[in-house]
Amino acid sequence: MQRRHFLKNAAAALAALGLPALPPWALAAKAVGLRRLGQPQPFDYAWLKGQARALAKAPYKSHKQVLPGPLESLNWDQYQSIRYRQDHALWADGNGKFQAKFFHLGLYFHTPVHIYDIVDGKAQQLAYDPAAFDYGRSGLGGKQLPKDLGFAGFRLNTRKDTDRDFSAFLGASYFRAVGKEGQYGQSARGLAIDTGTGGPEEFPDFIAYYLEQPADDSDTVVVYGLLDSPSVSGAYRFAITNGEVLVMDIDSALYPRKAIERLGIGPCTSMYQTGENDRRMDWDWRPEIHDTDGLAMWTGGGEWIWRPLCNPPHLRFNMFVDENPRGFGLLQRDRNFDHYQDDGVFYEKRPCLWVEPKSGWGKGSVQLVEIPTVDETFDNIVAFWNPQAKPQPGQELLMGYRLYWGAHPPASSPLAHCMATRTGLGGIVGQKRSHFSWRFAVDFAGGELAALAKDPKAKVEAVLQVSRGTTEIVSARPLHELKGYRAMFDLVPPDEGTQQIDIRLFLRANGKPLTETWLYQWTPPPASERKIY
């Protein structure tokens, strides 16, 4: 499948997951029992792993279906007008803290998902019921749809706020969640396959979900998922705890059908169009447009790394080799509304997503894929863990990790961290430039920097390395507005070529690092476009 076509559609649909309240006439005062199929059957995670293992032993069969004509022809506005009725919400007739509602098939969603309710250790399939939906302006009201149509996915609400969901699973293996800010942003996936290889990317599907009815006093919803694709099948367990920072405790068991070139564990999918450091696509009236602004990594060796994101002119792939990583994630550090000026999508409220392995993942790499985009409707950033050993048929891969959704990751470096990265034409103002250079201004705050900024005897230096070219006008000076420091330098690229240049920077005093490590990758313009004005 071509990634751009798939993600442009999926991103637009997922962006609207936080739907407004249903109109009063669409609600009923009393909960209505859901229709079910068959008899309850014993269920546990071991049984689900057995189902995934059996799938992997059989030839793959596509789960996508040709939908009835009226569903195939829905446009965006028509599909968005279809709402699940509150009176049919799963667990609405109980006393627990949570409810679940379901998404209708149609538009971009052609793969039916079977959804089961688990009560007292037994699972029973929920039946598609047209009466559970309000069809709005879709034109589907009163039309006969198959009784075995199925669903596209589901969303979770609290009983105290049935209008807004805090997590949603919709499309392929995509899912999202929010922290206390209540604003959706980036997505996670069950699995990424062959992302950034230059060839077609494979998008596995969750083909069944099993929702376990929580105890009345529980703060956690447990969801199981059965995943399938041409290359692999899998069983997943999600323990979702809602709160100021939403936590998903995930166990997955993967069963490859064939060798996989690039397997992505814990994939985060985001969007970066333009920001302080990269204004290649800055024709929009808004100063910055991004779900996240950087990749953070806490390596197995204890190093903290910050890599600002870019919207590159060409597909860009980076690999950060590690062993037993402690965590990584795509973060939105910039929380200032003035930097975005968008009161419709609220980029300053978009959640960070931090991936924390529950055990040693061994050797591999955190991989970052940055894809060119011309607008915000295309999710062009992906980060994931890629095991060094390529999965082989017949193997069982057990991976456990936690996902944290919120304004800040659960772990942070005691050292100062990067607050902003800005770039522009180099040189000295007021003096004629004799050659082309590109300036970088990197702001750090936290750790010991506030105290050092007040000390006139402090000797803070910028430790800088570049893979190509030369640097000049290197400095590190206090920035009192941030109670931190600003490192600045000009990078002079080689005379010819547009080969990417890798940059590494941190601040140091008395031989001791003061900041996390800042990494960057810059693509110099062709020699003919290097204007010095």
Curated annotation (Swiss-Prot):
One of its GO terms (molecular function) is carbohydrate binding. It comes from the Bacteria. The keyword Disulfide bond does not apply. It is found in: Periplasm. Pathway: Glycan metabolism; osmoregulated periplasmic glucan (OPG) biosynthesis. Residues 1-28 form the signal peptide. Pfam families: MdoG (PF04349). Keywords: Periplasm, Signal. Coiled coil: none annotated. Gene3D superfamilies: 2.70.98.10, Immunoglobulins. Transmembrane segments: none annotated. The keyword Mitochondrion does not apply. Predicted to be exported by the Tat system. The position of the signal peptide cleavage has not been experimentally proven. One of its GO terms (biological process) is beta-glucan biosynthetic process. InterPro entries: Gal_mutarotase_sf_dom, GH-type_carb-bd, Glucan_biosyn_MdoD, Glucan_biosyn_MdoG/MdoD, Glucan_biosyn_MdoG_C, Ig-like_fold, Ig_E-set, TAT_signal. GO terms for cellular component: outer membrane-bounded periplasmic space. Belongs to the OpgD/OpgG family. PANTHER family: GLUCANS BIOSYNTHESIS PROTEIN (PTHR30504), GLUCANS BIOSYNTHESIS PROTEIN D (PTHR30504:SF3). Probably involved in the control of the structural glucose backbone of osmoregulated periplasmic glucans (OPGs). This is Glucans biosynthesis protein D. The gene is opgD.
